């Protein structure tokens, strides 16, 4: 099974600001999610550039799902607080983050779990089926409800 998608680009405002991002419009950050040239700039999730673990015959990006995005954001926020309070920074390497994903594929879906986002992994499994689709639908409803009612 192969899925081919068009190249993903960052937003125009970031991509077109000299020195802010790479050619594709993704922000370069370190493991504290701080920009190397702009110390007051932190970024997380889809906005950041994550280096692929190796070269492939066909250029590909690195998936940035909700779970690692949340981990990046928590690290960035903790480091903003650390900057304000003069405390040491925390670091969270993308490669070391666990992989948790419920992917919707129409009327089906997949639950994906791994001990690391990127290879090499010691443990990983994928469970396809309609249950994953319904889990995704249920989680989306819960997530939106919880945010509307300030249950974070």
Model regions and ranges:
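FAD-site-proximal beta/loop scaffold in flavoenzymes
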Residues: 1, 5-71
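C-terminal, flexible cofactor-proximal segment of oxidoreductases
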Residues: 75-152
């Amino acid at each position: 099974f192969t899925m081919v998608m068009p190249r993903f680009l960052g937003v125009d405002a970031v991509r077109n600001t000299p020195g802010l991002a790479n050619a594709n419009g993704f922000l370069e950050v370190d493991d504290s999610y701080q920009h190397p040239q702009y110390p007051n700039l932190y970024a997380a999730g889809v906005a950041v550039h994550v280096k692929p673990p190796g070269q492939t015959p066909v250029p590909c990006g690195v998936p940035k799902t909700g779970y690692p995005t949340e981990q990046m954001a928590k690290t960035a926020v903790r480091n903003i607080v650390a900057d304000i309070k003069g405390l040491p920074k925390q670091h969270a390497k993308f490669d070391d983050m666990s992989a948790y994903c419920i992917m919707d594929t129409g009327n089906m879906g997949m639950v994906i779990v791994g001990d690391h986002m990127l290879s090499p992994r010691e443990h990983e499994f994928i469970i396809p089926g309609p249950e994953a689709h319904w889990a995704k639908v249920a989680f989306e409803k819960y997530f939106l409800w919880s945010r509307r009612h300030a249950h974070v």
